[in-house]
Amino acid sequence: MSKVGTSDSKNTLYCSFCGKSQHEVRKLIAGPTVFICDECVELCMDIIREENKSSLVKSRDGIPTPKEICKVLDDYVIGQNHAKKVLSVAVHNHYKRLNHQTKHNDVELAKSNILLIGPTGSGKTLLAQTLARILDVPFTMADATTLTEAGYVGEDVENIILKLLQAADYNVERAQRGIVYIDEIDKISRKSDNPSITRDVSGEGVQQALLKIMEGTVASVPPQGGRKHPQQEFLQVDTTNILFICGGAFAGLEKIISARGRSTSIGFAAQVLAPEDRRTGEIFRHVEPEDLLKYGLIPEFVGRLPVVATLEDLDEASLKKILTDPKNALVKQYQRLFEMENIELTFADEALGAVARKAIERKTGARGLRSILESILLETMFDLPGLEGVEEVVISREVVDGTARPLYIYADRSDRAAESSASA
């Protein structure tokens, strides 16, 4: 039923699906003799999304087309259209190669691992995680800064394969078709141009150790993790068909690219990389293998990463969308927190723009948005549980800039500007 006919609530409307009243939900949508609340609409959308994702994975012998992959990436990742296209094609070709490698023996298709280059907070990790979710394959992440050569204090390279095996519930066959994302790959660049000066166990040494598993080898993985012991039984995992995606911010690489452009370009080509005010992401578009070698990656390692996808700095419009559009957008998260206190949280459009500009100034990208919102809402979240009668909190551009306090709107509407005075 959508209405209850008691004397005290005869005009109250109820959701026909979950039974909640109009006072318990934010929106109640009316249809012919039925009503549905915003929470049920969101639940239905989630169900449809999951079904679409399942049908996507099952189509074409389990290989979605590049356009299908890119379309799903669009639902989770804002912007970065060039990187999405590069990744969609590379991943499609990789799994097509796996499904057909036993059918044709005349041409052997080589594996194409991927290198993601982009500024901090541009979405490298999110892209890799979303790809694994789309394809329904085991996925693991590793931090390159914790890896060391075998025999030294730190994490063995083969522990990455162990984590992938754990993600596959120790199903070796599934693990061998998984995706490994290695973050902070730029931090293992060679510390010196002369490779023989010192033993570089966390730089060039790790690159050397990664070569074999990235190209394809049978790794002996101890089931319990940690260092190997002679008495242990090892699991044999073939890494030939595991897709490796490496990502890094590569701070300073833009200077190497720009220097190459200035030294090699003359005449009409001289303007390609010359402007110093170009954004880092735009300069990354022109990266060449020789730039990565100068940065400190060894030639063999660069050769194992034939597909390079560059990500751009997120502009103000993209950061505003990140704040509001995704399913778990930050603004939606804070609005849900305030709903628990029966208070509506509203951000003015100019306020969202100011938050985005702050993130750009700090050069933190999307990763810095949460800390900015946290600092803006700290005093409000501290005060509200002890205040009575507050119905809505409005965040304006002045609040973000620090020249005003949030506007508290009380239920009786008689004191709309109680907390809007400029802060000292």
From Swiss-Prot:
GO molecular function: ATP binding; ATP hydrolysis activity; ATP-dependent protein folding chaperone; protein dimerization activity; unfolded protein binding; zinc ion binding
Record InterPro entries: AAA+_ATPase (IPR003593), ATP-dep_Clp_protease_ClpX (IPR050052), ATPase_AAA_core (IPR003959), Clp_ATPase_C (IPR019489), Clp_protease_ATP-bd_su_ClpX (IPR004487), ClpX_bact (IPR046425), P-loop_NTPase (IPR027417), Znf_CppX_C4 (IPR010603)
Pfam families: AAA_2, ClpB_D2-small, zf-C4_ClpX
Keyword terms: ATP-binding, Chaperone, Metal-binding, Nucleotide-binding, Zinc
Domain ClpX-type ZB: 3-56
Record PROSITE patterns: CLPX_ZB
One annotated Gene Ontology cellular component of this protein: HslUV protease complex
Assembly and oligomerization: Component of the ClpX-ClpP complex. Forms a hexameric ring that, in the presence of ATP, binds to fourteen ClpP subunits assembled into a disk-like structure with a central cavity, resembling the structure of eukaryotic proteasomes.
PANTHER family: ATP-DEPENDENT CLP PROTEASE ATP-BINDING SUBUNIT CLPX-LIKE, MITOCHONDRIAL (PTHR48102:SF7), ATP-DEPENDENT CLP PROTEASE ATP-BINDING SUBUNIT CLPX-LIKE, MITOCHONDRIAL-RELATED (PTHR48102)
Descriptive protein name: ATP-dependent Clp protease ATP-binding subunit ClpX
